[in-house]
Amino acid sequence: FKVDFNRFISGQSYDLLKKLNFNNGFKDPTFVREKIFYDVCEAAGILSPRATFAEVTFNGTPWGFYTVVEQIDDQFLDRSIGDDEGHLFKAGSNFGGGDDEASLVYLGSDTVLYENAYDLKQTESNGWEDLIDFTLAG
């Protein structure tokens, strides 16, 4: 689940972050793979979100053990590269329920061909066109 500190009162944050993701690791019997992956990426100089562990309780009821992960957004970009301008895509598979995957393969010049595999989260302008140009160059 995601906690958005600005959802009801604008300007709120926790440790200067507007959002945090709580991942329950239901597919990871060790509960540590995600955090280790982010730590290895950081050690290798690869941009990665900050992560930690938390034992979560809600109104006194234990909810379980979670990996808490920084939201990939403009704040992450500003902290990581000193610039929050430009395009931010969430790449994955089956956003639209089909067989499309975010493989960075050129699919054609129609932006609709990319919308099931990529989710444009942030852009200044021409986000889809720049993604198409990027895949064409590969």
What are these language model-derived features?
Residues Y14-L16, R33:
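Short, conserved acidic/polar surface loops in the N-terminal third of protein domains
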Residues G25-N59:
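A conserved helix-loop-beta module that forms one wall/lid of the active-site cleft
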Residues G11-Q12, T30:
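Short active-site-adjacent helix-start/loop capping segments
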